[in-house]
């Protein structure tokens, strides 16, 4: 909270395709969707943010489309599969990490749990047949519940699931957090697990506890760090919470504590009127993070490249970190403009 300002770097295929979620890439190859050909100027990005007073840069290493901006050994749907960029030898996350290390900028990792592309997402047998269906239990023509097909139990569904998405996600966490070339001096201060999921997404339970243990093993006290890694979207393990809107505004009265139940793995941050207001007597400190778009979208595009005015940005500041009783951390997207990449 004392840092006040964090930058949110949204960069990936969506940057080149004028979209936000990447739900319709289908079978397009990395070369078709990731159209970067010139070298990525990470140093200018980080240096500019540092000079502007930002203390942390959170990077979307994998957004909902499933494309990885680092060279991943877990998938070919990544920057190394985009052979038009540095002959398949590029690694954008490594480039940003190197710049953050040189300029001593704290880093956060955004790794979307929802993955539109990877075939392990959801529950399917070896033939690719779905093991879970979305059904209408109220007989009103509106599907409302996911349940196993053909009378299977949930245990049988998990046994017959041909590919384990939770393992895939966990292995990618290890791949990034366990490699010293990623992060500021090999370290991430925060991991962002976005709860967004499209209406047409397959059903998938997340093994959050396993993921949290992995994160802290590398980035927390268990990994010989001074403090545990801050976690966003981590249910009862959340230590950085969403402010409740994407306007950059906190409630007039915002408290930093939430009520969590570790046994039930639930969190209550007193959500009301588009804000998470927190509680004065909650049992867990959860930094309220006020994220906002600096233009009309999270990703840059020709149709959404006009930034908000100084008056609008000033209002965001004063309605988030600018007043002592709001106590929120303000997070703005640092766009990767195609013109900046050289």
Annotate the PLM regions.
Residues 1-342:
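Mature catalytic domains of secreted/periplasmic carbohydrate-active enzymes
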């Amino acid at each position: 909270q004392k840092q006040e300002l964090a930058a949110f770097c949204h960069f990936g295929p969506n940057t080149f395709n004028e979209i936000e979620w990447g739900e319709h890439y289908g079978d397009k190859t990395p070369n078709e969707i990731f159209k970067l050909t010139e070298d990525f100027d990470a140093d200018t990005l980080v240096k500019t943010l540092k000079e502007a007073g930002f203390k942390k840069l959170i990077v979307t290493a994998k957004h909902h489309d499933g494309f990885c901006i680092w060279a991943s050994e877990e998938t070919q749907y990544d920057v190394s599969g985009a052979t038009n960029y540095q002959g398949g030898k590029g690694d954008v996350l490594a480039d940003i990490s190197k710049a953050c290390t040189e300029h001593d900028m704290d880093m956060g990792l955004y790794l979307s749990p929802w993955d539109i592309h990877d075939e392990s997402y959801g529950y399917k047998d070896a033939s690719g047949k779905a093991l879970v269906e979305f059904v209408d239990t109220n007989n009103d023509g509106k599907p409302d519940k996911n349940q196993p097909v053909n009378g299977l139990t949930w245990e049988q569904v998990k046994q017959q699931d041909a590919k384990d998405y939770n393992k895939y996600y966990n292995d990618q966490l290890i791949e990034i957090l366990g490699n010293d070339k990623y992060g500021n001096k090999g370290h991430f201060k925060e991991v962002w697990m976005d709860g967004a999921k499209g209406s047409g997404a397959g059903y998938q339970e997340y093994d959050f506890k396993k993921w949290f243990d992995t994160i802290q093993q590398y980035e927390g006290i268990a990994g010989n760090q001074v403090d545990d890694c801050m976690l966003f979207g981590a249910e009862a393990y959340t230590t950085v919470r969403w402010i409740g809107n994407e306007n950059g505004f906190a409630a007039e009265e915002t408290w930093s504590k939430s009520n969590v139940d570790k046994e039930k793995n639930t969190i209550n941050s007193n959500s009301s009127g588009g804000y998470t207001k927190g509680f004065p007597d909650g049992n867990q400190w959860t930094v309220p993070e006020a994220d906002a778009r600096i233009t009309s979208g999270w990703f840059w595009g020709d149709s959404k490249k006009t930034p908000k005015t100084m008056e609008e940005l000033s209002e965001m500041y004063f309605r988030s970190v600018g007043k002592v009783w709001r106590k929120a951390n303000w997070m703005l997207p640092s766009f990767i403009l195609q013109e900046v990449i050289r």
